[in-house]
Amino acid sequence: MRNVTLRQMRVFTAVARYGSFTRAARELHLSQPAVSQQIKLLEQEAGLPLFEHIGRTIHVTAAGQELLRYATQVTDLLREAGETLAAMRGLKRGVL
């Protein structure tokens, strides 16, 4: 999985969390077709389906569950890094 983007990870975790492409799109301020395209690209990169569509319901596949563990770690670490850097920007700097 050499060409996976952070955007794809965020989209993937949102779809898995909400069980809906439409709701994930709304949450991420993207169009539903943009979400579908990101998932399609991610599935192509993985070489496996990540979601199973049963009627109007979306379920995460076994491969999707495995990827979700890693994608959640990646997105959590990125959020934490952003929070740490934001806190550092708030520190006064100087020589004592």
What residue spans do the PLM features occupy?
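Extreme N-terminal segment that seeds HTH/winged-HTH DNA-binding domains in transcriptional regulators
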Residues: 1-11, 17
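The N-cap/first-turn positions of alpha helices
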Residues: 5-8, 32, 64, 71, ...
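Short helix-boundary/capping micro-motifs
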Residues: 13-30
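Core residues of bacterial helix-turn-helix
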Residues: 27-28, 39, 46, 67
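A short LG(V/I)-centered, amphipathic sequence patch enriched
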Residues: 43-60
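Alpha-helical linker/hinge and terminal dimerization helices associated
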Residues: 45-46, 50, 67-89
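Interdomain hinge and pocket-entrance segments immediately C-terminal to HTH DNA-binding domains
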Residues: 56, 86-96
